Amino acid sequence: MPRPPICRRVEFLPGVTYFKPAAVPLRELEEVVLAVEELEAIRLKDKEGLEQEDCAARMGVSRPTFVRILNSARDKVADALVNGKAIRVEGGYYHLVGPKVRCRRCGHEWEPEQGGKEACPRCGSEELAGRGPGRGRCHRHGRFGEGEH
């Protein structure tokens, strides 16, 4: 029986969780599911440009585990791009760390004050990502908004 996976720390929940090729009806597409921690690995390494050791530390895993997560994520993204598949970001074994909130409208990120208003300080939008299930204890997650399993 395999060991349960180590809970991964994630600092960011995406505002958009579905990507598909243009001009192809959804019903005709195959789908690739990218776990939240796989997206986090791509964000840390490819978007922020951190070294693998730093990425692993931020996610709370060993460097070899980080490399496996990153390689799995890159393989899924490449499969979707090369073969014209949709990408759905959902699920995984993670907990959200840090109080950062991201505005889904303008992309601004900030650390809200305790008891502060739940709206973007830049554009005033109340459409926020980064609040909700996933903080604290680690759980296996399904789709966003379905809670913890």
From Swiss-Prot:
Residues 129-149 are annotated as: Disordered. Pfam families: DUF134. InterPro entries: UPF0251 (IPR002852). Belongs to the UPF0251 family. PANTHER family: PTHR37478, UPF0251 PROTEIN TK0562. HAMAP family: UPF0251. This is UPF0251 protein Moth_1655. It comes from Moorella thermoacetica (strain ATCC 39073 / JCM 9320).
